[in-house]
Amino acid sequence: MDFTVIRSKRKSLSIEIKKGEVLVRAPKRTKDKEIEKFLLLKKDWIEKHLEIYKERNKNLIPFTDDEIKEFTRKAKEIIPERVNFYAEKIGVIYNRITIRHQKTRWGSCSSAGNLNFNCLLVLFPLEVIDSVIVHELCHRKQMNHSKNFYDEIEKIFPEYKKYHKYLSDNGGQYLRRLP
């Protein structure tokens, strides 16, 4: 079995399946023999999850460059307008908005107030887009994921949990289609 070992300042071994590859995360001084023993112990889990990955991705057709450009164009039309609406409602300011095709995130907010959004959001209902926008704008008040942060979101967007779950349940199939 092929695998990649990533050594770092950590205390325990872990295995991750990422894009069909086996990644072993290990403390810096872990001996190769110990890693091999760990892999043998986790062999069934690894095989099961590699199979799940293959099954999930076998019929996925990657988005073309033209499709991504079109998603980006639409996102640049829709998202800034929604951000302005909710920023005023929440009472926050932001620096700039960037639309990207990120493979792992739907949105982010930097401490400088820069907002980033995934162009693939345009493939979802407007309420899903709004839930991501409100989440990122609420970071302008609290740069964390505390209970207070989520209470702030709920004040502005009471159905946040419903649409966040929708994106969690359905978003991966689109992210996996990015080249």
Which residue ranges define each predicted feature?
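Walker B catalytic acidic pair
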Residues: 136
